[in-house]
């Protein structure tokens, strides 16, 4: 049995901590045989391969009595780059407990658990459901809408350095004034409405006019402005920080993708440039 969870790109500008899409990079966990102790085969560097791994910790949090197994983990989701690497592990851990513990969890229950562990639903929701998900957490209640995502292309630049979410949150203000909050939420409302109605030019303007986090975090990602300028010059709808960064996502018309890819490539930045697709399935067994 194999558990597969997609990478995710959260926020999409002003949808701070509440909106995200699933994209075509994946964490996969093969459930192998029972063993005396938990052991995870992987070639992912310094990640623990015993029960201190977040995957197993999450599973045991839900089902502490499940038998130890040997697992195999593979992933092309880069760590601490803004593509939901920790969320994918949390969601996989929940499903691991669900399968081995025969918990029969509903998708809604998985989301509630994942949000409680992660602290916000913007990554875990699309990791579970795929597509574009807009979610709200009030206390213990998590409401969400799975929405159709427009037909467009995604080009992502992944810098070769990590940016921890905690460090990226440290640059955010502790509070906004009432006037700032109204302005920021109006931009978010417009971005969502424009995405859902297919008005991609207005969606792009709203995404790039975020007032919640990007105006504070941009300085942490030196590649952001050069990529944004190159993408805009070649017809992109929007460029935004994926999650807390440092990954940078460009939304563009399908016919502009290659020109934008080549323009970013010519900047000579150090990192990985990839073309991504929307993942429509989310968490699944394969």
Swiss-Prot record:
Enzyme class name: transferase
Recorded metabolic or biological pathway in which this protein acts: Amino-acid biosynthesis; L-threonine biosynthesis; L-threonine from L-aspartate: step 4/5
This protein's UniProt keywords: Amino-acid biosynthesis, ATP-binding, Cytoplasm, Kinase, Nucleotide-binding, Threonine biosynthesis, Transferase
InterPro entries reported in the protein's UniProt record: GHMP_kinase_C_dom, GHMP_kinase_C_sf, GHMP_kinase_N_dom, GHMP_knse_ATP-bd_CS, Homoserine_kinase, Ribosomal_Su5_D2-typ_SF, Ribsml_uS5_D2-typ_fold_subgr
Source organism, top-level taxon: Bacteria
One BP annotation, GO: threonine biosynthetic process
Reaction catalysed by this enzyme: L-homoserine + ATP = O-phospho-L-homoserine + ADP + H(+)
Locations listed in the record: Cytoplasm
EC assignment: 2.7.1.39
Disulfide bonding pattern of the chain: none
One MF term in the entry's GO annotations: ATP binding
GO cellular component: cytoplasm
Entry binding sites for ATP: 78-88
Role of this protein: Catalyzes the ATP-dependent phosphorylation of L-homoserine to L-homoserine phosphate.
Family per record: Belongs to the GHMP kinase family. Homoserine kinase subfamily.
Full protein name: Homoserine kinase
Native source species: Streptococcus equi subsp. zooepidemicus (strain H70)
